[in-house]
Amino acid sequence: MLKRDMNIADYDAELWHAMEQEVVRQEEHIELIASENYTSPRVMQAQGSQLTNKYAEGYPGKRYYGGCEYVDVVEQLAIDRAKALFGADYANVQPHSGSQANFAVYTTLLQPGDTVLGMNLAHGGHLTHGSPVNFSGKLYNIVPYGIDESGHIDYDQLAELAKTHQPKMIIGGFSAYSGVVDWARMRQIADSIGAYLFVDMAHVAGLIAAGVYPNPVPHAHVVTTTTHKTLAGPRGGLILAKGGSEELYKKLNSAVFPGAQGGPLMHVIAAKAVALKEAMEPAFKTYQQQVAKNAKAMVEVFLSRGFNVVSGATDNHLFLLDLVDKNLTGKEADAALGRANITVNKNSVPNDPKSPFVTSGMRIGTPAVTRRGFTEADVRDLAGWMCDVLENIHDDAVIERTKNKVLDICDRHPVYA
């Protein structure tokens, strides 16, 4: 017999201890990994609900199992909210992750061996945009495009590559690019050769929902996103489209189920519905505006302290530090800041001489710290502390002083008050 007062702490102390330590880590560390964020308690409530018990293969009104009348309501709410939030006329909320959403798009629009233009991973792209270690690089003929000397997407190069290689699909989107993408220009290039434009907006979906960053949905044939990152929802994926045919939408649905997945995670879909509603609130727009302001404020400090910021600016929630001229590796920077309770991730930079396991750069993002209530003044202080550590990575006293400052500001800005 199952009882509602069953809990992990009384049953599995070893596991519970690790979970509790993670709670402490999140509260006592400053999170600057650009792809991470904090979900609301409402989102977590949905993920811990009894919806996890329900199998619901298929789509609302067309299930392979009985007893789906209420999960149909849940999924339809998520679909309708996704369409309304991003101005789409099609949404699939079932992908378990952004990568699986991307896989569904590839299998819908392409055949193995087709040519695809994707952003070079070292220039800011993503594994699923053509990395040789990923399915995208293994199954398709990938032609990478990149950024120019100023750190911005080279649209002339992209147009020339498209003309030369005649890809069937061009991918827009990124995991480490701090500029604004000209979606209309990308669509123009795609149309000039009869290619599909597929946009992966995972990193900027929250900014787009709030009107802080341009929306690719009116320009792309298909758009995907994660529902975490800047959108601040549960970990999962989403597929969107506007102005496409019913045939395309049916193919996309079939590519998700039964093509790549079985039963959807209904508790996660409920959490997506909650997060999408939260993203429609005025407070969410204010939050996203502050995310962008905080990123700009941090860039100003790093530049003033003599650090090289790729492109010299940011127009979204993230930026890259190029540490080559500081004689530092990304791995060293990551470790030193980690000792001061500041969490970042090492990241390759354009023309990086180091391996992806070492790198010469560091990616910094502001969604999580802004979620805690950090202001521009707070992140300017934070950026200054980071510079102190990066300039003295072997000085334990500097790192300890910085850690104490971090603990103090974390105490003043709890993740969950």
Curated annotation (Swiss-Prot):
Entry binding sites for (6S)-5,6,7,8-tetrahydrofolate: L121, G125, H126, L127, S355, P356, F357
CDD domains listed in its UniProt record: SHMT (cd00378)
GO BP annotations, alphabetical order: glycine biosynthetic process from serine; tetrahydrofolate interconversion
Location(s) in or outside the cell: Cytoplasm
Pathway info: One-carbon metabolism; tetrahydrofolate interconversion; Amino-acid biosynthesis; glycine biosynthesis; glycine from L-serine: step 1/1
Site (Plays an important role in substrate specificity): residue numbering on this chain: H228
UniProt main location, coarse: cytoplasm
GO cellular component: cytosol
InterPro entries: PyrdxlP-dep_Trfase, PyrdxlP-dep_Trfase_major, PyrdxlP-dep_Trfase_small, Ser_HO-MeTrfase, Ser_HO-MeTrfase-like, Ser_HO-MeTrfase_PLP_BS, SHMT-like_dom
Cofactor: pyridoxal 5'-phosphate
Record's signal peptide: none
Quaternary state and interactors: Homodimer.
Described function: Catalyzes the reversible interconversion of serine and glycine with tetrahydrofolate (THF) serving as the one-carbon carrier. This reaction serves as the major source of one-carbon groups required for the biosynthesis of purines, thymidylate, methionine, and other important biomolecules. Also exhibits THF-independent aldolase activity toward beta-hydroxyamino acids, producing glycine and aldehydes, via a retro-aldol mechanism.
Protein name according to UniProt: Serine hydroxymethyltransferase
Taxonomic lineage of the native organism: Bacteria, Pseudomonadati, Pseudomonadota, Gammaproteobacteria, Enterobacterales
